[in-house]
């Protein structure tokens, strides 16, 4: 059985139940390895160049990223034991591209993510694209 010591947990902060399930899975998989590094990532998708985006304040993206970072830190504080090594990553861009780029850059052993939003059948388009284009193993949860 392969041991995973560097896990990337991709979460959607607007669906916390799925995020909690992904975290519990990663913690269970590394239960006997407290030195394993768990990287939790949340991706803020870009606003399309549209009429709506032209109405937003100049630093709107920075404010959104700062809020996402705060929410991710709050989430990890509530859902990870204090003694676990957790790295927080908030990225801005196309979800599947950012997840795959981060997985490569951080040389993770495994990506954990949810299949789709709660109550939806099948796989989300981002999950499919992460699986299709990633060079890393992926654990997709329902």
Task: For the regions a language model picked out, list residue spans one by one.
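General small-molecule cofactor/ligand-binding pocket signal
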Residues: 39-41, 87-91, 139
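Small/aliphatic-rich secondary-structure junction motif
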Residues: 2-54
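Short, flexible loop segments at boundaries between secondary-structure elements
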Residues: 131, 136-142
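Glycine-rich, Arg-bearing micro-motifs that act as flexible, cationic patches
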Residues: 111-133
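A short acidic, glycine-rich active-site loop
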Residues: 58-70
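Short secondary-structure boundary segments
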Residues: 42, 115-116, 142
């Amino acid at each position: 059985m392969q041991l995973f010591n560097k896990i990337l947990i991709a979460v959607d902060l607007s669906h916390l139940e799925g995020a909690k399930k992904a975290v519990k899975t990663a913690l269970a998989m590394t239960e006997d390895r407290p030195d394993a590094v768990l990287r939790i990532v949340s991706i803020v998708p870009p606003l399309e160049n549209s009429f709506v985006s032209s109405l937003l304040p100049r630093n709107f993206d920075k404010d959104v990223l700062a809020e996402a970072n705060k929410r991710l830190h709050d989430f990890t504080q509530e859902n990870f034991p204090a003694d676990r090594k957790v790295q927080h990553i908030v990225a801005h861009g196309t979800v599947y591209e950012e997840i795959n780029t981060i997985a490569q850059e951080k040389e993770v052993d495994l990506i954990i993510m949810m299949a789709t939003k709660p109550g939806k059948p099948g796989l989300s388009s981002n999950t499919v694209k992460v699986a299709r284009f990633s060079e890393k193993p992926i654990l997709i949860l329902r």
